[in-house]
């Protein structure tokens, strides 16, 4: 009853504020249910760029809300939990990227969208896990600097003819997924297909039937003719997969693959955000104008 009451108040305030609620696939189930749109980083960036709402309430981690603010400076962007950060995004700063570039002059920088606005501003083009290969292939240079995720960089390197020089960052949640977990699960579910996220270690992706972004996982699960899928990504993804495919069995590779930051946003915080119009996420204009080019170039890659 309490949850229904909060959800009702959120729906009322959303109309009053002319707001849209965007949520990442790793958010709590209650947040996914309250959202107008749930997706992966690429889908959310595209939605933020074209949405006609006056207020964007972004349920994710800070860099995602920042990306919305970069793309839609005329809109109010709210983060219900402003302390929800991203450890991988914090593994490189703008100053560190400038130093990295100075050691490899003239090379283009591909920046995973899981990064700060300052890092995006120092990059030539952004990418997500869904379009990283296409983005890298779109560049004329034979050698590319890739930040901050070394494992996504390794995934791209295997699938392109480019030389990839990666920054040694990683996602702690995906790093907890071990190859032996997949091997053990396959013994119990021999008919299952294995799908994993490209932020996983190479020895994990090597065991997968498909390596997919979370958005691609949604599409794959819907059309796959198998009834059992072993899923290697952050645990929140399982909620959406089960909700949309009740006739299929989804087995997480690891219950330890949890992003605590993604779980910080709750229904009461979402309600408070709409009630108080907090916390507003903004990007300094001198950084935004540099970062928006990298994000928009990514969105133009088909």
From Swiss-Prot:
Top-rank EC class of the record's enzyme: transferase
Question: Where is this chain's protein located in or outside the cell?
Answer: Cytoplasm
Q: Which GO terms describe its biological process?
A: 'de novo' NAD biosynthetic process from L-aspartate
The UniProt annotation places iminosuccinate binding at 24, 41, 112-114, 129, 197-199, 214
Reaction catalysed by this enzyme: iminosuccinate + dihydroxyacetone phosphate = quinolinate + phosphate + 2 H2O + H(+)
Any single Gene Ontology cellular-component annotation = cytoplasm
The record's listing under Pfam families reads: NadA (PF02445)
Which Gene3D superfamilies does the UniProt entry name for this protein? NadA-like
Is Transferase tagged as a keyword? Answer: yes
MF annotations from Gene Ontology: 4 iron, 4 sulfur cluster binding; metal ion binding; quinolinate synthetase A activity
The annotated pathway is: Cofactor biosynthesis; NAD(+) biosynthesis; quinolinate from iminoaspartate: step 1/1
Where is [4Fe-4S] cluster annotated to bind? 86, 171, 259
Provide the alphabetized UniProt keywords.
4Fe-4S, Cytoplasm, Iron, Iron-sulfur, Metal-binding, Pyridine nucleotide biosynthesis, Transferase
Q: What InterPro entries does the record point to?
A: NadA (IPR003473), NadA_sf (IPR036094), Quinolinate_synth_type2 (IPR023066)
Q: Cofactor note, please?
A: Binds 1 [4Fe-4S] cluster per subunit.
The EC code for this enzyme is 2.5.1.72
Function comment = Catalyzes the condensation of iminoaspartate with dihydroxyacetone phosphate to form quinolinate.
User: Which named protein is this?
Assistant: Quinolinate synthase
- The organism named in the record is Dehalococcoides mccartyi (strain CBDB1)
């Amino acid at each position: 009853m309490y949850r229904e009451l909060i959800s009702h108040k959120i729906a009322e305030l959303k109309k009053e504020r002319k707001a849209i609620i965007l949520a990442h696939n790793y958010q709590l189930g209650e947040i996914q249910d309250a959202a107008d749109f749930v997706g992966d980083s690429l889908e959310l960036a595209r939605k933020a760029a074209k949405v006609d709402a006056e207020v964007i309430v972004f349920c994710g981690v800070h860099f995602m809300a920042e990306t919305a603010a970069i793309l839609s400076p005329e809109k109010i962007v709210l983060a219900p939990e402003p302390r929800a950060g991203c450890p991988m995004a914090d593994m490189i700063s703008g100053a560190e990227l400038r130093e990295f570039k100075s050691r490899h002059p003239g090379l283009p920088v591909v920046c995973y969208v899981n990064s700060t606005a300052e890092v995006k501003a120092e990059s030539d083009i952004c990418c997500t896990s869904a379009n990283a290969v296409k983005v890298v292939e779109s560049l004329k240079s034979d050698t590319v600097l890739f930040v901050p995720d070394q494992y996504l960089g390794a995934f791209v390197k295997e699938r392109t003819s480019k030389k990839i020089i990666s920054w040694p960052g990683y996602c702690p949640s995906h790093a907890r997924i071990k190859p032996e977990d997949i091997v053990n699960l396959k013994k119990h579910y021999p008919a299952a297909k294995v799908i994993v996220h490209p932020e996983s270690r190479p020895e994990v992706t090597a065991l997968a039937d498909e390596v997919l972004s979370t958005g691609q996982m949604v599409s794959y699960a819907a059309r796959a003719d198998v009834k059992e899928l072993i899923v290697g990504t952050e645990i929140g993804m399982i909620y959406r997969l089960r909700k949309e495919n009740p006739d299929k069995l989804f087995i997480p590779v690891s219950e330890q693959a949890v992003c605590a930051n993604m779980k910080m946003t709750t229904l009461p915080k979402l309600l408070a955000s709409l009630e108080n119009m907090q916390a507003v996420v903004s990007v300094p204009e001198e950084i935004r104008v540099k970062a928006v080019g990298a994000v928009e170039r990514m969105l133009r890659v088909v």
